Amino acid sequence: MKYELFFFKEGNRYLNLDELFSFFNYCPFITVDTTKDEVEARYSNKAIGLEASFHITRVSKVPDIHRLDPKYLDLDIYLSIDPMMPMYNVGVIVDLVSDLCQKFDFFVYNILFENVAPFRKELILKSYEKIWELYKLKFPMEYTSLNYIAKDKVNDIFKYLYERKDLEAYCHDQNLFFPVPRFIKSLGTGEVYSVVDLLNDKYFVFPPKCD
């Protein structure tokens, strides 16, 4: 089960594929692979554990497409992401979707939308959270095996991880150490803590929300 977001255009299906591939290739976290059935633009950011895929297929993958407003035409392109990602990671991908929609005049659709809609970040995030809840109900054992960290805490930590390399580059002449947080779990309480390893011979930047 994945969260899927489908892309449409209004009134026509024209799309310059060279420009689309250039858009994907410009992103340093994306690699493009082609098979006989589809083109996959795979987004992978190891720093925050973010994996996502844009698929360009030969046939439509939109469920119940017949019930949608016919003025919107399916482009056979969709985004697929894990249904239980941290919301910070979801926001990173949705920001990329925003750029995609703005550049190519795309509209978006998810099975929880009433119809195809213009890009609205809050609409996509809300539908993702609903899919997350449905996934939790459908696969309770998988959910209970997860470790819980408060949303504001994990968002701040992931934001730091996402920006860490840029921070290092900006401060390269100051000999600052930017540690990578690790998560440890108390065997007694089950609570998860964020900790870092420090170097004795360097000044360091203390990451946000570390315990």
Language-model features, listed with the residues they occupy:
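Short, extreme N-terminal segment that most often corresponds to the first beta-strand
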Residues: 1-49, 147-162
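A structural detector for beta-sheet-dominated domains
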Residues: 8-10, 44, 57, 82, ...
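Structural alpha-beta junctions
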Residues: 26-32, 98-109
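Short, solvent-exposed beta-alpha or beta-beta edge segments that form flexible loop/patches at the rim
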Residues: 38-73
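Generic recognition of long tandem-repeat/solenoid scaffolds
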Residues: 39-43, 73-81, 203-205
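Elongated alpha-helical scaffolds
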Residues: 73-81, 85-102
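Short proline/glycine- and acidic-rich turn/helix-capping motifs at secondary-structure junctions
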Residues: 111-122
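Aromatic/basic-lined ligand-recognition segments
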Residues: 123-211
